[in-house]
């Protein structure tokens, strides 16, 4: 894969992931405001964004077998707890 393609897919994955969570947050607000149809619409859009993001992630070759996926999850969560958030706290 060309470097520019990889960078574009990575940026698209980040954008789709953020949109997915943003629309779920919007759905939560719509539920709190008793607008179930609007909430349903936001959840449908969130699902579409999730599908887009997963497709980008697959194209990047970042979805592996179960053992590798579990290790990636452990590594990511460990990094957040041991390094990322402590660094944020020290700023």
Model features per residue range: what roles?
Residues 1-91:
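Non-heme di-metal
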